[in-house]
Amino acid sequence: MKNKFYLYCILCFLFNVAGYSQSTVFESLSFESNKLGRKVSYSIYLPSDYNTSKRNYPVLYLLHGYTDNETNWIQMGQMKTIADRAIANEEAVPMIIVMPDAWDTWYINQYDGKVPYEDMFFEELIPYMEKTYRIRSDKESRAIAGLSMGGYGSFLYSLHHPDMFCACAPLSAAVFDDTVMEARKARSHKDLFNRLFGPGDEHWKQNNVLKILSDWDQNDLPKIRYYIDCGDDDG
């Protein structure tokens, strides 16, 4: 229920004003990634008039959480029902929603270069989507959001690529400070986080949302609309 409310809020926030929708959802499609050397699965939401119009649409990249996949927002979060309702109530514009699978990559480039997921996302996935579907390619028509691991990924991408997104909605984002990360690398997620971030702290610093924000000149913060939702017990 909490995830459904989150999604309704971000759809209304990211692209407000608009039309009616009786949409189509395709689950577990895929494209070949040269950077990863494997297929990348994704699910996609197409608005009601996609097949009868020639217009291009704004896009929301919606990222899943840890242990989830490209189908979870649809099967567990009722994404289609919520998006249809928001559009029908004119609280969101007709849009395309892309939900890629990220496995347990945390949406970053692995420190040793073996799994450059972030590079794949921006250099292959986004261009593929814009070539395959009628998606607007300007910043003001592209938003990103995610839950937990996906909240971290959406937050990180908005900071690493501020020229790419007009809005970002990290939901219960799994954002850690140095102390928590060191503890996780030593104990609870030892194999995973050491594989992703490496034995030192340099790669972690480059992908630490809190450090990036603290190092940023306040006058140069990205011009992105943020909707940040975090509960008292998140963390």
Segments from the language model and where they lie:
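Non-catalytic cap/lid and distal C-terminal segments of serine-dependent acyl enzymes
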Residues: Q22-G235
